[in-house]
Every structure is written in C-alpha cells, then in structure tokens.
C-alpha cells in the first residue's frame, strides 16, 4: 500500500516599483510518497522541486525494516541544495538476554534483557558526524533503565553533548531525564519496552 501527494502553489501577480506588471511563476512543487511494502518493510520520501530550474531543492528518502517487536532499523538520505547532504542510520534492537515478551508464564519475573537504540547522522559535505543519539536500555520486567548520550551540532566545529539517565518503574512513574522522549523523537519506529505492560502504549509508526 502507498500514497502519493503533489502540492503545487498558486501563481502570483504583482507590480514592480516602476509600475510594470510582473508575473511570478509557480513556486516549488512538493511531492510526498509512502509505501508499506510488506509486514516488515516501509519506505517514504518527500521532494521539493523547482519547475523553473528543473532541479530538486530538498529531498528526504527513507527505508525502514521492522521484523518484530522492539526490532527496527532505518536508513535515510537528506538533501538540501547548497546547504547540506546527509545520510542517517537509526535503530532499536535487542542485544543480550531474553525479552520479557518471550518468557511466557514467567513474564512477570524481574529478569533482564539489554537493548540498543539510537540515530547517527553523517554529513557528506563536511565528512563528519553531526547530530547523533546513542543509548542502551535494560528491561527487567518490572522496571526499565535507560542510559543515553545526545550530541547536537551547533556549528561546523561546535557541539553540545548531554548524558541522559532514566529509571522507569513500570506502571508507576519515571525518574530522571526524559531519555524515552529523546529516543522516541529520533528513532523511526521506536517502541517503548514496557508498552505491553503500561497503561499507555508508545509506538511510533
């Protein structure tokens, strides 16, 4: 299944300061498309196109693979003419231990499983890492611990870095910095580890 949207803008008319009529052609066209290829694969993209120069102005293309719960990986390409050109890798994946959802009758016991989640952007123009988030999550069944590092570029040679630590008592409360929100905002398809045990489900399509 897929969708395609095309949004042209209106033609504008005006008068120059010396009284001469002027007609501005159509401004950029915005195209957007998304496709759910099968149960595991998604793809989407947007393109801003200038009909006067017959060149793209901005574009984003992304493909995502999600074979199961708490398993997602995506790659993206971002382009802004004369400004930036980036590639991006984002993920959420189990790395060690038995997930709570696989323990059957013992799913309420406090065992442990480790997950990694994050997003890394690389500038093809500057040949360096730009914005990035990397984190680890430990799901003990009755509580979840999140640890992460967020790095934001504020200039070609300047960055801001912060460390996040959060403890979630499943079904009760969360303590510490909001690492959950940062991961949810940065990782396409990210799913909260306790979503099947909490009153609210946090799934990002």
What are these regions (language model features)?
Residues 1-205:
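Long, low-hydrophobicity, solvent-exposed regions enriched in small/turn-prone and acidic residues
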């Amino acid at each position: 299944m897929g969708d395609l949207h095309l949004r042209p803008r209106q033609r504008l008319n005006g008068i120059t300061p010396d009284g001469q009529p002027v007609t501005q052609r159509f401004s950029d066209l915005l195209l957007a498309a998304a496709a759910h290829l099968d149960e595991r694969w998604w793809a989407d993209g947007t393109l801003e196109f200038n009909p006067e120069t017959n060149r793209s102005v901005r574009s984003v293309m992304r493909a995502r693979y999600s074979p199961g719960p708490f398993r997602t990986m995506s790659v993206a390409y971002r382009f802004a003419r004369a400004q930036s050109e980036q590639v991006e890798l984002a993920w959420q994946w189990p790395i060690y231990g038995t997930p709570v959802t696989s323990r059957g009758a013992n799913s309420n016991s406090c065992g442990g499983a480790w997950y990694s989640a994050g997003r890394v952007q690389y500038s093809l123009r500057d040949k360096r890492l730009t914005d990035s988030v990397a984190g680890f999550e430990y799901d003990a069944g009755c509580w979840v611990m999140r640890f992460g590092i967020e790095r934001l570029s504020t200039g070609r040679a300047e960055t801001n870095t912060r460390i996040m630590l959060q403890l979630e008592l499943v079904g009760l409360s969360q303590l510490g910095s909001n690492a959950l929100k940062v991961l949810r905002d940065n990782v396409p398809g990210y799913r909260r580890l306790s979503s099947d045990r909490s009153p609210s489900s946090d799934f990002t399509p």
